[in-house]
Amino acid sequence: MSNNPFLEERLPIAVRLGASYNDEYAVEVTKTASGQEHRKLIHPFPVRRFSVHYTKSKGEIYDQILALYHRAYGKFKGFRVQAMDDYSTNGATGTPTAFDQPLSRLSAGVYQLYKVYGSTGAARTIFKPVAGTTVVAKNGVIVESGVTVNTTTGQVTISPPPLITNVITGGCLFDIPCRFDGEIDVTPLSPNYAETGEIMLVELINP
């Protein structure tokens, strides 16, 4: 984990309902003089970008959106965003189970939550699990006690530490760590209502 500043709060739900997004990969493409391409994958993690447009009362825009923007100092601090159709390790929106995803072993007894897309697809590191939703299994048996979840890093600690040969799986609901990727323009529509311009958010792979 990095030392970048992060606000442990979520973008308001009304904003999430109006968001569109896409996932992109860091691929460096170089073309030779003969027109041949050479492609290099910089890292294997998808980076999600959200585009949000918000029309509400002026009070809601100021109290919810602009207040978060100023608390974050624009692009400086990250915060949580829940994608409306991708917030669970069980499919996209299912109730998480202890058998959803393999956990990556970091050290003795410490594991990282992940979500793998497809049977051989890319993996998204889950840094921001939702509190109280993580369940874990060891060798196909649910671990009922001795599990501690750090909801700011997505790291799971199991005590006593499992053997290195044990298969550890888990599941949870999760938020995506993001930051603002531009300024916020506000246009008054009436004495009581206003709308924002396009609000760009970008996922953080080192929150």
Where are these regions (language model features)?
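Polar/acidic, low-complexity leader/linker segments enriched in S/T/G and N/D
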Residues: 1-27
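Surface-exposed ligand/attachment interfaces on beta-rich extracellular proteins
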Residues: 3, 33-38, 94-97
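Long, contiguous binding/interaction regions
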Residues: 27-30, 167
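Oligomerization/assembly interface segments of phage tail-like spikes and tubes
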Residues: 31, 38-58, 186-207
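Secondary-structure transition/turn motif
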Residues: 56, 115-119, 157-164, 205
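Short, conserved charged micro-motifs
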Residues: 59-65
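Extended beta-strand solenoid/passenger and fiber regions
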Residues: 66-146, 173-207
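A surface-exposed beta-strand-loop module
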Residues: 141-166
